[in-house]
Amino acid sequence: MTKKVYVKTFGCQMNEYDSDKMVDVLGAAEGLVKTDTPEDADVILFNTCSVREKAQEKVFSDLGRVRELKEANPNLIIGVGGCVASQEGASIVARAPYVDLVFGPQTLHRLPQMIDKRRESGRAQVDISFPEIEKFDHLPPARVDGPSAFVSIMEGCSKYCSYCVVPYTRGEEVSRPLDDVLTEIAGLADQGVREVTLLGQNVNAYRAGLTLGSTEIADFAQLIEYVADIPGIERIRYTTSHPKEFTQRLIDTYAKVPKLVSHLHLPVQHGSDRILMAMKRGYTVLEYKSVIRKLRAIRPDLSLSTDLIVGFPGETEEDFDKMMTLVHEMKYDTSFSFIYSPRPGTPAANLHDDTPREVKLRRLQHLQATIEENVQRISDSMVGKIERILVERPARKDPNELAGRTENNRVVNFPAPVASHARLIGQMVDVKIVKAYPHSLRGELVLVHDEAPATTH
């Protein structure tokens, strides 16, 4: 009987990518197939996030829920990976003795060996080392089911923002060799992928030799240009970038590479220079706005999303007002906004924080309401327009409809005959937007672009 693996993913798109690789590794080595129900699984993995305390505690809550499955089936393997694993290490096993594996983001390729050792020794296996970029040399070829795919181009972060745990859990910035990245993307294109999202904690820090042993270095702008030349790739996205390293070369790429979408996620974190300095972000509000101004001079239709932290230690009402001023000025398409969560081991965790939680909550609610108003305003402005979308899949709520995304990352659902679904998935189509909902759009099919073959499923 075929054995199965269940993976629950917390956090960022890097973790989503890593979770897919866990399935690929175990599929290639052990013949496991993915299941969406933990009750059916022979291996249960939690790919964790430690950016906020709430996400970290959710992991232990979920571990408690699968404990009964372990008691009913002692052969069940339970593993904890990701950033919580890197941070907590063997203490996870001390807190939850039924956990069999603890592994970091850089050691997921060792999962088959860790499972074997666990079965042989009867002891929990912990491997949270940082073996540079080794994991990419041991991963099987990427497998995809759809026209969009994530591709990790680098690991780690070297910025050491005062509030952030990522450099401690994922290590310093290490870029994948250029030819490795391009080979993976070319392989994905051969499988019908039309859109790639280049992933990293700080993608615009990418630096890699043009060829093995080469002294000539390719930066992130060059990488994008090379990706755009790969046959079959029609759209390029990336996340996440850092304002400090948003170079003029990268800005110029928006003029040179039409396949680079007019959507950018550029975390600002705050709108007060005083708070940005305390966060050790390395730029001012004016410098951030300068980047956006230059980009919008090239792409007036640029859609912008960001990350914002409310209630950082010492944040005053004046600081928050400056954040709101920036939000209004930038006209963000969306944002990921949260109340500051102190992370153990980071410098900011030692800062005095005397702002009452109810004040932080009020500020967050005001911020999010303002962003939502802007999101709806942008969506409403799209009604009546023709948008080119990449058809990705059947719509989740209605199997008679298809779904895809616009350049500015809006999900569009539109009716299409079921008999046409296989042909349309993976195609670029023009859709007229007829209605705007809070988190999606509804459209009508206008034109199918036949410049590339449909994906095979």
Swiss-Prot record:
Reaction catalysed by this enzyme: N(6)-dimethylallyladenosine(37) in tRNA + (sulfur carrier)-SH + AH2 + 2 S-adenosyl-L-methionine = 2-methylsulfanyl-N(6)-dimethylallyladenosine(37) in tRNA + (sulfur carrier)-H + 5'-deoxyadenosine + L-methionine + A + S-adenosyl-L-homocysteine + 2 H(+)
Source superkingdom: Bacteria
Binding site for [4Fe-4S] cluster 2: 157, 161, 164
Ranges of residues in domain Radical SAM core: 143-377
Cofactor details (free text): Binds 2 [4Fe-4S] clusters. One cluster is coordinated with 3 cysteines and an exchangeable S-adenosyl-L-methionine.
InterPro entries assigned: Elp3/MiaA/NifB-like_rSAM, Methylthiotransferase, Methylthiotransferase_CS, Methylthiotransferase_N, Methylthiotransferase_N_sf, MiaB_methiolase, rSAM, rSAM_horseshoe
UniProt-recorded Gene Ontology molecular function terms: 4 iron, 4 sulfur cluster binding; metal ion binding; N6-isopentenyladenosine methylthiotransferase activity
CDD domains: Radical_SAM (cd01335)
PROSITE patterns for this protein: MTTASE_N (PS51449), MTTASE_RADICAL (PS01278), RADICAL_SAM (PS51918), TRAM (PS50926)
Main location as per UniProt: cytoplasm
Any single Gene Ontology cellular-component annotation: cytosol
Compartment(s) where it occurs, according to its Swiss-Prot or TrEMBL record: Cytoplasm
Residue positions binding [4Fe-4S] cluster 1: 12, 49, 83
Ranges for domain MTTase N-terminal: 3-120
SUPFAM superfamilies associated with the record: Radical SAM enzymes
Family as reported in the entry's similarity comment: Belongs to the methylthiotransferase family. MiaB subfamily.
Annotated function: Catalyzes the methylthiolation of N6-(dimethylallyl)adenosine (i(6)A), leading to the formation of 2-methylthio-N6-(dimethylallyl)adenosine (ms(2)i(6)A) at position 37 in tRNAs that read codons beginning with uridine.
Name recorded for this polypeptide: tRNA-2-methylthio-N(6)-dimethylallyladenosine synthase
Organism: Paraburkholderia xenovorans (strain LB400)
Gene name tied to this protein: miaB
